Curated annotation (Swiss-Prot):
One of its GO terms (molecular function) is DNA binding. One of its GO terms (biological process) is DNA recombination. Residues 78-171 form the Toprim domain. Keywords: DNA damage, DNA recombination, DNA repair, Metal-binding, Zinc, Zinc-finger. It comes from Thermus thermophilus (strain ATCC BAA-163 / DSM 7039 / HB27). Belongs to the RecR family. This is Recombination protein RecR.
């Protein structure tokens, strides 16, 4: 069956997005074709993305020079969480528990992929340390994330900053039976009194 070219173009564009396969892309395109108000709202939102850029301080997404978090005077400026990506920053923000500032590295050390310290936003991090008392290394629990955390811990300690890592543990609602050995071991190491 032949589809209108504009529908095919939209379907191809949608299918390039993460988590959207060809069938889902086609369903979305058809939905938008029959719901013009939603299509216009989506087009307007996509147009607005042209104003989004990296925050000059932390690397988060911003519509101006600074992101809303860096602009927030109520944030604890003595506390800085280092994350690999903006998605990681948003995950920490959703917890509602972290009230400091963030720094987005833009990845993790990965020599096999040619990603060394110079490929990450480290100079920006080191420039931000004045007034920072604690840096939380909130990198992922992968080999690359751990290597990045170890490297940064050494560099930050040389600069006289307290360095911490988030506690490891079991997920809420998770069963011990299904937890891997490393997670269980770290959960036991990090146990605290009740």
């Amino acid at each position: 069956m032949r589809y209108p070219e504009s529908l095919l173009k939209l379907t191809r564009a949608l299918s390039r997005l993460p988590g959207i396969g060809p069938k889902t892309a086609q369903r979305l395109a058809l939905h938008l074709a029959f719901h013009k108000e939603e299509a216009e709202a989506l087009a307007e939102a996509l147009e607005g993305l042209k104003r989004v850029r990296a925050c000059r301080e932390c690397g988060n997404l911003a519509e101006g020079e600074l992101c809303p978090i860096c602009q927030d005077e109520d944030r604890d400026r003595s506390l800085l969480a280092v994350v690999e990506s903006v998605a990681d920053l948003y995950a920490l923000e959703r917890s509602g528990e972290f009230r400091g500032l963030y720094h987005v590295l833009g990845g993790a050390l990965n020599p096999l992929e040619g990603i060394g310290p110079k490929e990450l936003n480290l100079e920006g991090l080191f420039r931000r340390l004045e007034g920072v008392e604690e840096v939380v290394l909130a990198t992922s629990m992968t080999v690359e994330g751990e290597a990045t955390a170890l490297y940064l811990a050494e560099e930050l300690k040389k600069r006289g900053v307290r360095v911490t890592r988030p506690a490891y543990g079991l997920p809420v609602g998770g069963s011990l039976e299904y937890a891997d050995e490393v997670t269980l071991g770290r959960a036991l190491e990090g146990r605290r009194p009740v």
